[in-house]
Amino acid sequence: MTATSSHGARLTIDLGALAANWRRLAAEAAGAECAAVIKADAYGCGIAQVAPALWDAGCRTFFVAHLSEAERTRAVLSDATIYVLNGFPPGSAPAYRAMGFRPVLGSRSEIAEWAQACRSLGERLPAALHVDTGMNRLGLNPAEAIDLAGDAVLGAFQPTLLMSHLVSAEVPGDAITARQIAEFARVRMAYPALPASLANSAGIFLGKAARHEIVRPGYALYGGNPTPERENPMRPVVRLEAAILQLREVAAGETAGYNARWTAPGPRLLATLSLGYADGYPRAGSGRAEALVGGVRCPFVGTISMDLVILDVTQAPPEAVRRGAPVVLIGDGLTLDEVGQRAGTIGYEILTNLGSRYDRHYIEGSSLSA
């Protein structure tokens, strides 16, 4: 961090590590195409920067959630294949056609609407078929999907992919995962010529039965651990730092933060940092989160507020405790997954909520440590 930081907190995103993670996942899934999920503004890391970095690494197929995200991706990647996971809004088929987007269709009514739109446009436009194998969220049920295989409606457009989504691929030996793999294989028999996709980040590490022709990593690309029961095979991509705004000595019995929820058990040195829940750092981490000051873990005290947090830096090295000194909130061993766990959530939520107020710094070569 620099003293000229306009916010007082910096988010560093390592595009070199991102590309290395994609190559690592592509190698793990050798024989399948490795796509990339870049929904939610590339998991908070920025579509405009992330998508070209992945393209340069060799990725050619991208998945987003909404049409607006597809448009932002197309603005930086003119030749990429772009699937829209949440299907298509009524009346948007001309936009999909003009921009070359492929909706993921998950119901008979949506399929009928897409087919009718293709007839009206006079063109068999591409689309994916989504089968629900256990999530009960989006998708055709397996019986519907098998029945659909013989329906003339498929002749009105060009099916290019059969896909489903794993419920708990990160849980070793999970029975639901085994059932989903088997169910998807059964449905796929009705579509022998259609490329298929089932594996997410964790699914890539389940072996060939889950991979099929296309794998769809998301969280792991950005440094999240796809194998939480084992050491993380991915390189860290994000680093969050904030500068110390103010130092304050408090005596035993004094309180800090809203509602006086923390009381000093003895003399303490407190540091206030310029970030809070408005920046995506979860309020639920109050009293549970930690940050690194001079390499020493220091606890958050009091309630995390909108723009400020307070640390107990009593045990930090004296030379690291000064106004303007950097504090690490993600990085150097404080992982996304740990930050999420301490806040009672998951690393995905931490990553995608990292706010727009940070000074963002993109680097091409990996200099971040786990």
Swiss-Prot record:
Modified residues (N6-(pyridoxal phosphate)lysine): 39
Record has Lipid biosynthesis as a keyword: no
Pathway annotation from the record: Amino-acid biosynthesis; D-alanine biosynthesis; D-alanine from L-alanine: step 1/1
Organism per entry: Methylobacterium nodulans (strain LMG 21967 / CNCM I-2342 / ORS 2060)
Designated name of the protein: Alanine racemase
Gene3D superfamilies linked to this entry: Alanine racemase (3.20.20.10), Lyase, Ornithine Decarboxylase, Chain A, domain 1 (2.40.37.10)
InterPro entries: Ala_racemase, Ala_racemase/Decarboxylase_C, Ala_racemase_C, Ala_racemase_N, Ala_racemase_pyridoxalP-BS, PLP-binding_barrel
Keyword Isomerase: yes
Taxonomic lineage from the root: Bacteria, Pseudomonadati, Pseudomonadota, Alphaproteobacteria, Hyphomicrobiales
Enzyme Commission number: 5.1.1.1
Keywords linked to the UniProt accession: Isomerase, Pyridoxal phosphate
Function: Catalyzes the interconversion of L-alanine and D-alanine. May also act on other amino acids.
HAMAP family tied to this protein: Ala_racemase (MF_01201)
GO cellular component: cytosol
